[in-house]
């Protein structure tokens, strides 16, 4: 049960990017692991600090083959195994530190996101909230090639996606890209958790996320990536 007199609950109660109305403050760390496991293979999860102080809110959606998990949690340590998929982390508050492939990375809300290839990693967060979603590197590589206008070859795109990358969210092109992602994620959210993941609207929304993720990774190609994504007419969501 949440401790109502703890000021951290105010941070935990801030809106999640999806599934906010379904998420309640809880100390059930297995629930958080279950939601994150829809995007990356969680090996273990533990609170940073005394176990009795851990609390979180989390929710999820599935669009096509993509899992999206939104969460806000007190400081947490997460171990993730190797995967055939890659993942992107975008924070709304707080920061997260990553150790993978012998290197250290820092993701911070509003300034730096994180691209995670399918290698194992360790993540340690402050009191933080944000979104993680998974992608197929083979499919994402095709979107990178398309956004490049033919200057990036498929083998080079796949090589890029085998490397961890801090995403510069302060690049001039990012405002439009992040707005587009926000629109897509909100649309997925409004369709609710009971919508069939392989329904045409959700698959189209997944394709939009792929296109805009290519722009996150190659911001100089963002204009072409943005042009490749066209919002669906509202009637197609019915």
Where are the predicted features?
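Short acidic (Asp/Glu) patches
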Residues: 71-75, 92-94, 110, 115-118
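Alpha-helical bundle regulatory/interaction domains
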Residues: 2-24, 34-40, 47, 98-238
